Amino acid sequence: MNSLLIEREMIMLYHYLKENYIPGEPIFTGDIDIPGMTEENLRYHLKRLTDSGAICRFEPGVYYFPKTDIFGERMSLSPDTVAVHKYIMRRGKRVGYYSGYTLANRMGLSTQVPFIQEISSNFAPALVRKMKIKNRQYIIRRPVVEVTEENVSVLQFLDSLKDIEKCTEMELEKCGKILTEFARKNSITKKKIDRFITKYPIKIYKAIYETEVEYVSS
């Protein structure tokens, strides 16, 4: 490939990135789709753009346009931002949610703040795996079904019940009230629950009974 074509291809990549990503949003090389551009050329152009200062490299396979602070200094991405974009909201599409102890804390079912965040994601590389993003560790789990914007609240509700004994230090009746309010706020009906509850361990029925949780009847 001659130098003119190489330059054109790099400019095309730069415009593609500018049109599809905002400052502070992780760019995963696996998500870049430019017809005719090989993986080898993509890596080459990303390196050139990084060397020129047009974009920044967070870690292998992850780049970004940096935000600037009030002093005009470039701000680096945080591991949590990368984790959210990689495993929870990928290119604006719901692909996962916080789970386990992290979910219990975010739902108000526990006051404990877990050191390692847990996420259930369609992009989980295995059934359960501990992953490291820079200096932070995450537990990534495969969900019982594919996560979508339509079913995420039901899965969070059922996950919370499944892990209720393990993840909360509160009285179960109080947990039931919190989950009942969550169910009402998110219009979680028995019909929606019945679609997924058989994917969960049988102990979930015990949790429903003991918490006296209620959900929308229809």
Predicted feature residues:
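Short, Lys/Arg-enriched N-terminal segments with co-localized hydrophobic residues
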Residues: 1-11
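Short beta-edge/loop segments at beta->alpha junctions of small alpha/beta modules
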Residues: 10-88
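Short gly/ser-rich loop at a beta-strand->alpha-helix junction or flexible surface loop bordering the NTP-binding
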Residues: 58-62, 89-129
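Short, surface-exposed loop/turn motifs that are enriched in glycine and acidic residues
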Residues: 74, 89-93, 147
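Hydrophobic alpha-helical interaction segments
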Residues: 143-218
